[in-house]
Regions:
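Macromolecular interaction modules
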Residues: 1-264
């Protein structure tokens, strides 16, 4: 696939749980203020999108015991932002300073919990076809669904080994199915700045952790039992990594309260 001048370098993955009774106002605050004021107005932040896990989608998450969430019902909203390659340090410094400014200005929303807020280094991506959607456009495409897969490398294995397994074994089979993804990306955790907000959890075993984002042009729950419901066992069977989490999300509907009554 031809490379153009805009390339994804790093990404911000923010999974949050609004406190019950505050979900509607949280949703409105986030998309009408924080989505833009917290990230999108920043230099080198070239894309962003929001996803939601309804109650029925959370029921598909596994395993129940995961470092990603304290329990499967937690982590209803996911926001992601793309940062231009070569400008992570510039963006990161601005981002931390900006969020402190928003706190001081009273523009934050205390009735919510950060479940998993982590910066990731984008490593590689794989579209279904050679002329498919590049990762740089994934958040602008409005994919109907997203499946998040998380794992940790086992001793003696490298991220390159898992890339080869995904490219050569898992993806060719999945791309040919109705439940399979249109685009797969792979990322590894980055450290937060020392003065990042204290309520943002840090990642354990970061050097072995990986995040796969599987963008789907269909309902992510479709064909679950034969598809993503087996991803964990397939990853474990590869011998390369320990499976930590698989979870489906769907697009939010900007400007509406859609899905706020389906979270729990």
């Amino acid at each position: 696939m031809k490379q153009y001048g805009i390339q994804l370098g790093t990404l911000l993955f923010i999974m949050v749980e609004p406190w019950k009774g505050h979900e509607v106002e949280y949703n409105r605050w986030y998309e009408r203020d924080h989505f833009y004021g917290g990230c999108m107005v920043g230099a080198y932040n070239f894309a962003g999108d929001r996803f939601v896990a309804t109650r029925s989608l959370k029921e598909l998450r596994y395993p129940a015991d995961s470092p990603m969430t304290p329990e499967p019902s937690v982590g209803s909203y996911l926001a992601m932002y793309w940062v231009l390659k070569g400008h992570h340090d510039d963006w990161n410094r601005w981002s931390v300073d900006n969020v402190h400014m928003l706190h001081a200005a009273g523009r934050m929303f205390p009735e919510r919990t950060h479940v998993h807020t982590v910066l990731y280094q984008h490593e590689w991506s794989l579209p279904r076809t050679l002329t498919g959607t590049p990762i740089e456009l994934a958040l602008d495409r409005d994919y109907a669904g997203l499946v998040v897969n998380v794992g940790e490398l086992r001793g003696g294995h490298r991220h390159e080994d898992l890339e080869a397994w995904t490219r050569e074994q898992w993806s060719p089979a999945a791309f040919g199915t109705d439940w399979g993804p249109d685009l797969v990306s792979y990322a590894t955790p980055l450290p937060l700045l020392d003065d990042a907000p204290a309520d943002v959890p840090r990642v354990a075993n970061a050097e072995r952790r990986f995040l796969q984002l599987h963008f789907c042009d269909h309902d992510p729950a479709a064909g679950w039992d034969d598809g993503y419901g087996r991803f964990g066992e397939q990853l474990e069977a590869s011998g390369l990594a320990t499976h930590l989490w698989t979870a489906p999300f769907k697009q939010t509907v900007f400007g509406t309260d859609t899905y706020t009554d389906e979270l729990w």
